[in-house]
Amino acid sequence: MPTPTKGARLGGSPAHERLMLANLAMSLFQHGKIQTTETKARRLRPLAEQLITKAKRGDLASRRRVLGVVKDKDVVYTLFEQIAPRYANRNGGYTRIVKTGPRKGDAAPMAIIELVEELAVAQPKANKKTAGRKAAQQDKVEALAPAEETPAPTSGDQDAEAPVSVSGDTAAARADSDLAVEENNEQNKA
C-alpha cells in the first residue's frame, strides 16, 4: 500500500486529491500545457511523468493502468499514439514547470506546467512511389518554366504587337492559362 503524502491534502480528502490530479493530467495531455497553482503543478508532475512512461511501453496492461487514472479514452489514445512516441529517446523529464507570479484574486503563486516538446501535427508519411512521382512532377515543372519565358523585346520589336490567335488571345495569355491548368491538375492529383 502506498504511503500517503505528508501534510495537508489538495482539496480535502485523498479521493478528491486523486480525482483532481487525474483531471489536471487529462487537461495537460489534451492541451500540452496548463496554468495552475505551483503546489498543484508540483504534485501533478510525478503523476504525469509516470503516465507517459507507462504509455511508452504501449502494451495492453499499461493502457489499462492509464485508463484507471485518466478516464477519457480520447486522451488516452492521444497519450499513447502522439505524446509517448515523441519521448521514445528520453528517459524522463517530460514536463517543465515555469513560475508565472501571483494570481490576481488571492495572490496564490501560479505556474505553468507543460510538456517539454511542443505538440506537433503529425505529418503523413509519403511512400516511395508517391515521393518519386512528386519529384518527377517537380522536375517537369522546373524544366517547363524556363521554356515558357519569353525573351525580352529588342528595340525594334517594341512597336510590334503580340501575335493574336483566332480566339483573340495573345500568346502570353495562352501560356498563362496553360500553366494555370497544369497547376490545377497537379493539385487535384496530390
UniProtKB/Swiss-Prot annotation:
Record family assignment: Belongs to the bacterial ribosomal protein bL17 family.
Chain spans, region Disordered: 128-190
Organism encoding this protein: Salinispora tropica (strain ATCC BAA-916 / DSM 44818 / JCM 13857 / NBRC 105044 / CNB-440)
Subunit: Part of the 50S ribosomal subunit. Contacts protein L32.
GO MF term set: structural constituent of ribosome
Lineage: Bacteria, Bacillati, Actinomycetota, Actinomycetes, Micromonosporales
Keyword Ribonucleoprotein appears in the UniProt entry: yes
Transmembrane segments: none
Protein name: Large ribosomal subunit protein bL17
Presence of keyword Cytoplasm: no
NCBIfam families from the UniProt entry: L17
Biased amino acid composition, Low complexity: 143-154
This protein's GO CC annotations: cytosolic large ribosomal subunit
One Pfam family it belongs to: Ribosomal_L17
Any Gene Ontology biological process: translation
Keywords noted in UniProt: Ribonucleoprotein, Ribosomal protein
InterPro entries tied to this protein: Ribosomal_bL17, Ribosomal_bL17_CS, Ribosomal_bL17_sf
Gene: rplQ
Stretches with biased composition (Acidic residues): 179-190
HAMAP family (UniProt xref): Ribosomal_bL17 (MF_01368)
